[in-house]
């Protein structure tokens, strides 16, 4: 879990737009966040396996 202070800091509007960065909406992780879902890869995988994300299915080829 991310530190609450860093999550709070990321939610504030930055002084300059380039300083903004994405964080996972579920756990607050700053790396490998999918913009479309707003989730990190770990949370995305957990929620997809649980069937909590409509339209997401495991691919096979």
Curated annotation (Swiss-Prot):
The UniProt annotation places Zn(2+) binding at: 24, 27, 40, 43
Q: Which GO terms describe its molecular function?
A: rRNA binding; structural constituent of ribosome; zinc ion binding
Entry note: cofactor: Binds 1 zinc ion per subunit.
What's a single GO BP term from this record? translation
Keyword annotations for this protein, in alphabetical order, are: Metal-binding, Ribonucleoprotein, Ribosomal protein, RNA-binding, rRNA-binding, Zinc
Cofactor(s) the protein requires to work: Zn(2+)
- One Gene Ontology cellular component annotation held by this UniProt entry: small ribosomal subunit
Q: Which InterPro entries does the entry link to? A: Ribosomal_uS14, Ribosomal_uS14_bact, Ribosomal_uS14_CS, Ribosomal_uS14_sf
| One Pfam family from the record | Ribosomal_S14
Oligomeric state and interaction partners are given as: Part of the 30S ribosomal subunit. Contacts proteins S3 and S10.
Q: Which family is it part of?
A: Belongs to the universal ribosomal protein uS14 family. Zinc-binding uS14 subfamily.
For this protein, the record's NCBIfam families field holds: PRK08061.1
* Summary of the function given for this chain in its UniProt record: Binds 16S rRNA, required for the assembly of 30S particles and may also be responsible for determining the conformation of the 16S rRNA at the A site.
- List the protein's name: Small ribosomal subunit protein uS14B
Species this chain originates from = Mycolicibacterium smegmatis (strain ATCC 700084 / mc(2)155) (Mycobacterium smegmatis)
